[in-house]
Every structure is written in C-alpha cells, then in structure tokens.
C-alpha cells in the first residue's frame, strides 16, 4: 500500500532536508521513488478492474518510465559525481531500481494481466508494445514455475552485478552484458 511518504518524511528526526548530506538526501529520494514505483507494480499485480489500455497499460508504462528514469539518474550520478559517498548512494539506488526491474519482469500476475488486455482494436504501436512486452516477460522466464523464476532472478541479479563490476554500465543503458534466460 502507498504510504504517501515523501523524501522529507524519511529525513532523520530533528533534521531538516538542508541538514542532510547530499548522499543521504539521494538515498532518501531514491527510497521514496522506488517505493512509489513498487506501489504501482503491486497495484497492477492485484488489479481487478477492466483489462484495457487505460486500466493496465498506462500504469504499466508509468512504472517502466519511473524505473528507467531512476536507473538513468542513479547511473549518471554514480559515474560522474565527485563525492564518493554520493556515488555509493547512487550505486545503491541503481541496484534498488534494477532489482525492481527484475521483479517486474518475473511477475506472473503482471504478465497474465497484460496478456489479457485486448489490443485488437488498438493502434499498431500499442499492439506492438504489448507484443514486445509479453516477449520480454517470457525471455526473462516469467512462464516458468516459482523455483525456476527464483533461479532466473538470482542469475539476472548476478549478471547485472558482473556487468556493473566490469564498468559495462547497466543493461538499461545499453550494457553489452546479456541477462541469462532459462
């Protein structure tokens, strides 16, 4: 459930946002943003409304935008900011977003929800979006049983860490590391 918390609410008690270090502020903002994106995912996983573009695809697209933007911002801060503590906070933030991305791609309830959306009368771009989205879920291993999905999750996380460790960037930014599938 969305707690409605904002970054300022997560600041240490007795301190204003101005008293918080830039690294701590980034960590607070990241946690808030990842929490907001996670709420969207959980709402979609529990969604019982009409399976149409407005009810399913728009919130899913918002989730994708939040995750992609968050990964990009964290990656840039991690690579170029002169403050080591802030770079570490950005690295931790990037990891949170990438974990959420993996969780999203392996969410069977979300996959099944998107698969139920009738796009037969939608425009060709929407139809293609759904086609590619479902393909990406399948490549991630969403159709496998829970034990294999857990293994996929572990392998994908390991691949992302190796990719980052080699300075190859993140897959969201065009890293040449391939996420293994089963």
Please describe what each predicted stretch is.
Residues 1-182:
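Zn2+-dependent metallopeptidase catalytic domains
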């Amino acid at each position: 459930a969305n707690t409605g918390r904002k970054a300022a609410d997560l600041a240490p008690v007795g301190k204003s946002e101005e008293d918080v270090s830039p690294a701590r502020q980034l960590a607070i903002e990241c946690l808030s943003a990842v929490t907001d994106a996670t709420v969207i995912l959980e709402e979609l996983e529990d969604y019982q409304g009409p399976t149409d573009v407005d009810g399913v695809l728009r919130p899913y697209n918002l989730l994708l935008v939040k995750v992609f933007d968050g990964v990009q911002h964290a990656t840039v801060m991690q690579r170029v900011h002169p403050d080591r503590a802030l770079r570490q906070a950005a690295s931790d933030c990037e990891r949170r977003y990438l974990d959420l991305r993996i969780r999203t791609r392996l969410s069977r309830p979300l996959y099944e929800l998107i698969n139920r959306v009738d796009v037969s009368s939608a425009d060709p771009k929407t139809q293609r979006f759904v086609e590619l989205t479902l393909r990406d879920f399948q490549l991630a291993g969403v159709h496998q049983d829970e034990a294999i999905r857990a293994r996929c999750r572990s392998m994908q996380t390991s691949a992302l860490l190796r990719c980052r460790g080699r300075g190859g960037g993140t897959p969201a930014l065009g890293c040449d590391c391939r996420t293994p599938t089963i």
